[in-house]
Swiss-Prot record:
Residues 343-359 have a biased composition (Basic and acidic residues). This is Receptor-interacting serine/threonine-protein kinase 4. Expressed in hair follicles and skin. Changing residue 189 to L: In BPS; uncertain significance. It is linked to Bartsocas-Papas syndrome: An autosomal recessive disorder characterized by multiple popliteal pterygia leading to severe arthrogryposis, ankyloblepharon filiforme adnatum, filiform bands between the jaws, synostosis of the carpal/tarsal and phalangeal bones in the hands and feet, digital hypoplasia/aplasia, complete soft-tissue syndactyly, lack of nails, lack of scalp hair, eyebrows and eyelashes, blepharophimosis, cleft lip and/or palate, and hypoplastic external genitalia. Early lethality is common, although survival into childhood and beyond has been reported. The record marks 388-389, 426-427 as: Cleavage. It is an enzyme of class 2 (transferase). Residues 22-286 form the Protein kinase domain. Residues 403-424 have a biased composition (Low complexity). CDD domains: STKc_RIP4_like (cd14025). Belongs to the protein kinase superfamily. TKL Ser/Thr protein kinase family.
Amino acid sequence: MEGDGGTPWALALLRTFDAGEFTGWEKVGSGGFGQVYKVRHVHWKTWLAIKCSPSLHVDDRERMELLEEAKKMEMAKFRYILPVYGICREPVGLVMEYMETGSLEKLLASEPLPWDLRFRIIHETAVGMNFLHCMAPPLLHLDLKPANILLDAHYHVKISDFGLAKCNGLSHSHDLSMDGLFGTIAYLPPERIREKSRLFDTKHDVYSFAIVIWGVLTQKKPFADEKNILHIMVKVVKGHRPELPPVCRARPRACSHLIRLMQRCWQGDPRVRPTFQGNGLNGELIRQVLAALLPVTGRWRSPGEGFRLESEVIIRVTCPLSSPQEITSETEDLCEKPDDEVKETAHDLDVKSPPEPRSEVVPARLKRASAPTFDNDYSLSELLSQLDSGVSQAVEGPEELSRSSSESKLPSSGSGKRLSGVSSVDSAFSSRGSLSLSFEREPSTSDLGTTDVQKKKLVDAIVSGDTSKLMKILQPQDVDLALDSGASLLHLAVEAGQEECAKWLLLNNANPNLSNRRGSTPLHMAVERRVRGVVELLLARKISVNAKDEDQWTALHFAAQNGDESSTRLLLEKNASVNEVDFEGRTPMHVACQHGQENIVRILLRRGVDVSLQGKDAWLPLHYAAWQGHLPIVKLLAKQPGVSVNAQTLDGRTPLHLAAQRGHYRVARILIDLCSDVNVCSLLAQTPLHVAAETGHTSTARLLLHRGAGKEAMTSDGYTALHLAARNGHLATVKLLVEEKADVLARGPLNQTALHLAAAHGHSEVVEELVSADVIDLFDEQGLSALHLAAQGRHAQTVETLLRHGAHINLQSLKFQGGHGPAATLLRRSKT
């Protein structure tokens, strides 16, 4: 219902609402300005926001202040200004468009943002303030700060809270209320603090804008460590500004330009600060923002000529209020210029590294409408339509430039409408000029489907790390698009190492729990590739930290394998299970021990992980550490309460068996020092000495012998350590055992001695060591001597060694004379 013109509710074109028109009141914010409620309009079927007065009882003065704020917001209708619909009678409040994302202050504190989004926010804020300052007279905001910069569902800026806004020169310092001063003081220029009677001008907002730039680049609050308002005021007046730490190790080059601009904007002398508004080039500050965010290869020409890109395209911008119809014409301009005609140049800002020039993408001529021309005049609104999606995009021709070089081989897309990124519900109440429209194209029978074309564009943007392009083309329905490989776009971004693209996908609510064909979630991939920034972003969402891939590995398994201490701590803070097992029964502790990640083992031990938890075949973490020879971990685990150094696997092997088998001398020594039994037997009755002798680890065998290992112990098959060393040809180990008085006459399977085994396998050097008058002609249970076995195996060198030492040739040996090998030849010669 409309208010009467003569009442305090006279609102011109604004509407007056009753409380009964709203339902579902939900408080979403509060402060010195009052309370903000999210409400649903009964008839409009959409969500709105109502900013109510902080007072329970609103007098006429407060009511008039609220009306004045509403009128100022109505007067300042612009794409980057928060739309206002009217006043609610009771409770008294300002009815505005609901911003789903909330304030910039909240967003900056929530998670790291993509650089392209940060640049776009700075750019859109500058354009919104430029609009206010271009009004006649200029409208001063006077309270510009992240809390008063709202963001819609697609992260576009809407400047709000005009409670302090005044027309140029009509307000004094004493108008500032102490309500909410603490959140505002860091954004106040020094002249406002110092000069009580000073008339305000546009330079006030310029200073505040500089602090906003600092906050967006650093994602911190200015003077956050200072808790006293007076101390902040003294610092600002004395010329202190927020510190400039390295914004980011891999920050884009545009940061340097913005930092220089920011430092100019927060100068103590307001006269040397740049301005938003101006003549010809739309104001010095807008020009500086564009210069910082447009490709660094471009340059400004002389005043009035515009910005020259490398392609010789010249962009001229004019004051947005050069005619009273400019807002309407801007909306019409957007409708006349589809999104598909906004193209990326070869020098778009790349957050990772400077892109290489691609001359085929940036033509020397620009076609617009029907007449080709080199120099085109563009209004500010046209320029903004080119820049608002990627900040670093330039103006190119329409049809022939509609694809990037990586997409030029694709057929043109088929028919079908592409949404602008605004849902149907949101678009009904979006401010004028905030929608970017695209038009249908004529279908072609040879064209790829729209989905396939869009999918390829998204893949190309992510793989190339073109975040600005991704921000432009990503539609809400495409966020969880399944690729041909079964992966999602988020999988692709993580796999390609494109952290900025992953940030944008997550900001657009990409599902972090989707799995690819291997069962891996983006968290698996991010942890495996040690992309810490993405890991932090993923864990900040509702995510299944214990999701398993096809091998039953969780993200914590990957962190343990890589020794990624940071990811391990983050996962444990999110209650990742330390007892999840993979297909081999290994927990993250088992994996960390297997891969020698002592730092992870210590973290898990501090978390109270049970080190006696058995994996497949009853392997403990200590078994894995001993098997791989990770001495520090063996020491650490062996000293844990309740750990037995003689713990056996399913086949009866102890950690000492495993260390001896792999020849880890130092591990074996520390285990023995910690009272490991050197004579413990496995299920095959093998002692650690048997294992060391069989694998030829002489130093470990010597250690075991000196620590009391039995030389004559036999396995379940009847082998001694000497038998095993001789059979496998380990000469050094055989010498050691002989020196240690091992029985060379001991009989094993088939009643064979160590010499029989060495001869049968052709180990001539071992035969040389073992041969003696006592054993050279001994027979096994089959009646074969060492010479018979060597000849049977056709080991000529071994036969020669035995013959040289006087081995006896008998009928059994002669049956091999009919052969043609070297062994048979030797036997025939010896017989002759």
